[in-house]
Amino acid sequence: MPHKIEGFFLLLLFGYEATLGLSSTEDEGEDPWYQKACKCDCQVGANALWSAGATSLDCIPECPYHKPLGFESGEVTPDQITCSNPEQYVGWYSSWTANKARLNSQGFGCAWLSKYQDSSQWLQIDLKEIKVISGILTQGRCDIDEWVTKYSVQYRTDERLNWIYYKDQTGNNRVFYGNSDRSSTVQNLLRPPIISRFIRLIPLGWHVRIAIRMELLECASKCA
C-alpha cells in the first residue's frame, strides 16, 4: 500500500505542465549522471518513475523544466530554513540567520552567515512533504566578498532517519562547486534528482566566511 501511495504522488507530480522553465547551463555530454539516466516516455505512468525504497529517481524524463521552490518569492517560510548552532545567532548575527539564505536578497542581512567557519556547519530545508528536487542555485553575500566555494548535500525523508549523502557516479560523496564571486548565480543540477523532505547543504570550502543565498529547483515535466 505505501508504494501505491508513493506512485500516485509521483503521478500527480509529473502530471502538470511547468509554468516556469530554467534552462540548464551544464554540458550534458560531460555530466556523468546524464550518461546513467534513462529517458522515459511520459505516457508510461508513475510506476516507471518509482522503485521501491528509492530516494532518487532511477528513470525520469530528465527534468527538462525546473520550478523554483520559493526561497526568493517567500513561498518557503522562515520556519522551513534552519542551520547549525541557531542559539548562537544573537546580537549582530541575529540579522544573518538561516531564513536570510534567499536568492537575490539585498540589503543588510541579505544572506545566511555561519557564525563558525568549519565543515560541521549546515543549512537545512524542511520541504514539509516529500518533493522531487532537481537542482540548487547559490549566491554569496550581497554586500561583501564572502561566499561558499564548494559544498556537499545530504537528504532524508523522515527526521527519524539517518542523513544520506548525495553520491557521484563512483559512489563517493559528491562535491558541488559553488561560487567564485558574491553576485553570480551558480546552478548545480541533480542527476538523478532527490526524492526527499529534508535537504542539507554542508559547506566544504568558502571565501573569507560561509555565506549563502540560495534557491532549490523542483522537478517538473513538460508532459501534460
Curated annotation (Swiss-Prot):
All copies of domain F5/8 type C, residue ranges: 63-219
Biological process, per Gene Ontology: cell adhesion; protein homooligomerization; retina layer formation; visual perception
Record bears the keyword Hydrolase: no
Cellular compartment(s): Secreted; Cell membrane
Disulfide topology: C63-C219, C110-C142
Keyword set includes Ribosomal protein: no
Residues annotated as signal peptide: 1-23
Keywords, sorted A to Z: Cell adhesion, Cell membrane, Disulfide bond, Lipid-binding, Membrane, Secreted, Sensory transduction, Signal, Vision
SMART domains documented for this protein: FA58C
Disruption phenotype: No visible phenotype at birth. After two months, mutant males display a profound disorganization of the inner and outer nuclear layer of the retina, with increased extracellular spaces in the region of photoreceptor ribbon synapses and the appearance of gaps, and a decrease in the number of photoreceptor cell outer segments. The number of cone photoreceptors is reduced threefold. After three months, mutant males display a layer of small, cyst-like structures in the inner retina.
GO MF terms held by the record: phosphatidylinositol-3,4,5-trisphosphate binding; phosphatidylinositol-3,4-bisphosphate binding; phosphatidylinositol-3,5-bisphosphate binding; phosphatidylinositol-3-phosphate binding; phosphatidylinositol-4,5-bisphosphate binding; phosphatidylinositol-4-phosphate binding; phosphatidylinositol-5-phosphate binding; phosphatidylserine binding
InterPro entries xref list: FA58C, Galactose-bd-like_sf, Neuropilin_MCO_CoagFactor
Membrane topology, record value: Peripheral membrane protein
Summary of the tissues where the protein is detected: Detected in the eye cup. Detected in retina, in the inner segment of the photoreceptors, the inner nuclear layer, the inner plexiform layer and the ganglion cell layer (at protein level). Restricted to the retina. At the mRNA level, detected only within the photoreceptor cell layer, most prominently within the inner segments of the photoreceptors. Undetectable in the inner plexiform layers and the inner nuclear layer.
Gene Ontology cellular-component annotations: cell surface; external side of plasma membrane; extracellular region; extracellular space; neuron to neuron synapse; photoreceptor inner segment; protein-containing complex
Gene3D superfamilies given in the database record: Galactose-binding domain-like
PANTHER family (UniProt xref): F5/8 TYPE C DOMAIN-CONTAINING PROTEIN, F5_8 TYPE C DOMAIN-CONTAINING PROTEIN
Quaternary structure, from the entry: Homooctamer of 4 homodimers; disulfide-linked. The homooctamer has a flat, cogwheel structure with a diameter of about 14 nm. Two stacked octamers can assemble to form a hexadecamer.
Function description: Binds negatively charged membrane lipids, such as phosphatidylserine and phosphoinositides. May play a role in cell-cell adhesion processes in the retina, via homomeric interaction between octamers present on the surface of two neighboring cells. Required for normal structure and function of the retina.
Protein name, UniProt field: Retinoschisin
Source organism: Mus musculus (Mouse)
Classification of source organism: Eukaryota, Metazoa, Chordata, Craniata, Vertebrata
Primary gene name: Rs1
